[in-house]
Amino acid sequence: MDQDTKTIIQYPTSGDEYDIPFDYLSRKFVRVSLVSDTQRILLDNITDYRYVSRTRVKLLVSTDGYSRVEIRRFTSASEMVVDFSDGSVLRATDLNVSALQSAHIAEEARDLFSTSLSIGQLSYFDAKGLQIKNVAAGVDNTDAVTVQQLNKIIADVVTTIPDSVADNIRGLWARVLGDIGITLVDGSFETGATITTRTQALWSISGRKCYTWAGALPKVVPENSTPESTGGISETAWVDSSSKALGVLLAGPSGAERVGLKQGGTVQDAINWLTFDSFDIVKDGSKDVTADIMAACVVANDLGLDIKQNDGTYLVSGNPVWPVYNSLDLNGVTLKLAAGFTGYFALTQKDSTTVYGPTSPIVQAINAAGGRTAGSGVLEGLVNSTELDGKFLFMEGADVLYYSRGTAKYWWTNTYLSNRGKLSDNLKYGVSAITKITAVTPRTKIVYYRLPNLDFGNGPANNGVIRVLNNTRFIMQGGSISNRPLKDVSKSPVIISLNYCAAFKAYDFFDPYPAFAVDSNNSLIYSYTLNFNDIADAVFENFNSQGYGWGVVGGQRSTNITYRDCNLNRVDMHDPYMGYLKVLDTRLGTWGINASGMGDMYLERVTVDLDDSAHGGYREHEGIINARGDFGGFHDGGLYIKDLTIVGEASAFEAASGHPVALVSAYSFNASLASIPESSPVTPWGFKEVIVEGLHCPFKRTGRRFNSIISAPSIQFTVYHPMRVKLEDCNFNSTAFEKFDLRGWRVTPYNPSKVGIANTLAFRPTNFVDVKDCSMVGLEFTRPTRAYDYSNFDVNLVNVKNVEEHSLSPFTLYTNQCGRYNLVGCGLQQIVDKSMTSGERANRRSTFSVTGGTWNSLSGNPTDITYGNGYDIPVVATGVMFVGPYSQTEVTGANLNVAEFVQASGCKFLSSGPTYIQPLLWSGAGGPTGASANFNVARGNTLGLNISAVNGETSQVIAATLVIPQGFSTGPAAGTTYGFTVEKNINYQLGLNARSLKANVGLVRCSDTITGVYLNA
């Protein structure tokens, strides 16, 4: 039966225990039956079967005569599991069970419909391949008939059926033989006939065959004869005509498709491709067959055929170049590479490439016209030319973009040109002149390469066993490495190499681990599973090369690269890529990603395992995601991360360096060898923006997770800090502050005049940091050294908390970087601001605003703000719940701290009790002559005053308020209130000393007596 049902399942009767794959509310709603094609029997629980577990039953009866066991849920629609009629307490679970029973009934109704006679999509009744029982005999012409009626009809006509069938077969043979010039005469062996020519054939009714006569003519055949009784069947007597018909069929245009081959396929396939077996190449690995494979490749190319061989082990040696112009299928083959082997398959597209130099008419036409500016999508010099239409272009230009390893790297771009100069990729940078174009014509059909297994047991010294050159529109699949040594000495093996390729996909290559190659001095040298240069629009999928080694690398001039579902120790791009680099659904090893870029990088659902215990702590770069330091350390584009998971720890690196890795790093190793000249159109960003949406760290880390979220651990100062950083849904799961270390970055491009920023509100923001829905112990901003300290950060923190430790360890913000800091809905412990210390760039004015959320300072103060010559701007808090060592009965450090450094509005204060309080700032007896005081209050705060008023024998405690003005000079701030019980006016006054944007209260005076001053937020 169709098993696409949720409440009915049938199993073959191959055992005595069977699973119940659906949920059910009661065992009485489960039915177990034995079923055959003609009968069904419902079994009884306990006597016929029993429950082994809630989801499994065991039969207790024989299944002889039955082919299937059916388990079906049949929930009662009248016998409700939950009864709401008795007036008892209604619980949520009751509603859930009742709803579930209704859902079960609905599912069973749908399954009953799907397994019953129903109307199909084309208006017919569908019996699902089952018998229809208990059908009445048909009456009208349009009624269904029963088997009984049909048997009677058959009995009436059965004697005529053989003749009808025989006539049909005879007619078919007459047509087939007629096509080859043979005539089927009237009559048969059974009725008698006469054959007069070699082109006549006689029909045998009983044998259902036709025969020609090879003996003496004429040949008279009497009635009731057979071929055997009238001369026999032989080459000189009766000849079966089917052999002649077969010859004609094989000679026809489709004849080759009708003959199979032992190794699979047909003769027609063999005409389309050839095999190594066609050349009798030894395939047990006992003989060197290098030359034989060369011969096969040459013949295949000459005849325009594919190569297909799916078994065998082939021993090869030397340095052969086996050219392949068409498809290659070596899946199942093992190439056993001899020691020192350096040969390769050259998978290429013959006559596909044309190179145009600077003096060629086509390049001169481009340079003489427009369209070479940044962002252009049309080369105007080609609008009226068709020469490059429909080609992939690899273009080079005259302008230096950057220096890497001391070498000037010139302008380039890879793209596809459709027609009239239209490019598929707009120019990232403009260029003064094009100097070279390599044009590759796309294939008119897709070719397929299925790669062999490569046996490295003999220690080959190859540099690219599979090389793809000047090629487009191909699909490369499979391939693997076996017997790879753990270490290669003085060898740099590269497995797959691609150059000047476009619009292709390569997938399912398995390298058990990347090669770890060293020179004779045991120093690391390159060795790659995959290497490519000058490619465009490439997809690498399900590549495996995980372990201690280099992994995969992109060389120069590569555009639009995607890695998907891969397992790699590292993704590397030597020269910067253009367009995009995408790493999707991939697992990376400790070295992560090293790639400078002139485009955008995308990481989605990537896991990075930092464990370097077997790596000795060696890292080329500090970060998990890095812009390559030996190529300038820049990344002129964005970094976009979704759902990044970090596991393992780089403990060996941390032990050697004294700090953990960074999340992102960008810096030059040596600015004299790797940098961007001022004339270059490249902007030296260390990623222009970094957007992280989802960072997951499932294992707790002691200390900070990253040395810096964005890092430039260098004194080269060659790249800019990202203009924008956004962190959302990130759980750092660490026990110490995370950090933005702003040291090592170039002076921001948004303050090129190096204006000293004394007030964050008086200068435009230079960098933006947004942190939302994140969990961390704290966040620290460490400012640059003085010569580079010209940044003004705009920082927004929304719903940032430490969810791992809950409210026991809320989030802390630490900074000495001038900026605007806005916190919304955070679980805050403390704001620490050292940006106005008396050292470098002293007395700068940062701003802080806190809106909503909880500010739990635990046992300490809510702020720790150090200033040099007066603190100008308080923290503005609106609608915040303050929790900490606040008191309404005694003056505490937390009381004084919040009043001095926080301008509070609409806030509440809690201490250990459940009642809101007003923090006490002063207590005493401030009467008409005044009482001295010494506490600071941020301007704009409202103070509450407790006044004890007396009028004769009548006394009253009066609560009054006094707002500290935003603008004032040293002097009194006064107010008047009225005592209704004492029936008189009460005057009060605080003596204030101006201290920038806060006031020092030095005197408390009242016409009666002020007994307490509180912060009234």
From Swiss-Prot:
Main role? Functions as a receptor binding protein (RBP) and probably mediates the attachment to the host capsular exopolysaccharides. Displays a depolymerase activity that specifically degrades the KL64-type polysaccharides of Klebsiella pneumoniae capsule, which allows the phage to reach the host cell membrane and bind the entry receptor.
Question: Which BP terms does GO give this entry?
Answer: adhesion receptor-mediated virion attachment to host cell; symbiont entry into host cell via disruption of host cell envelope; symbiont entry into host cell via disruption of host cell glycocalyx
**What keyword terms does UniProt attach to this protein?**
Degradation of host capsule during virus entry, Degradation of host cell envelope components during virus entry, Host-virus interaction, Viral attachment to host adhesion receptor, Viral attachment to host cell, Viral tail protein, Virion, Virus entry into host cell
Domain writeup: The N-terminus anchors the RBP to the virion. The central part and C-terminus probably binds and degrades the host exopolysaccharides.
Q: This protein's superkingdom? A: Viruses
The UniProt entry, under InterPro entries, shows: Coiled_stalk_dom, Phage_T7_tail_fibre-like_N, Serralysin-like_metalloprot_C, Tail_spike_N
Subcellular localization: Virion
Assembly and interaction partners: Homotrimer.
The protein's name in its UniProt record: Depolymerase, capsule KL64-specific
Q: Does the keyword Coiled coil apply?
A: no
Q: Which GO terms describe its cellular component?
A: outer membrane; virus tail
- Origin species, per record, is Klebsiella phage P510 (Bacteriophage P510)
Any one Pfam family here would be YadA_stalk
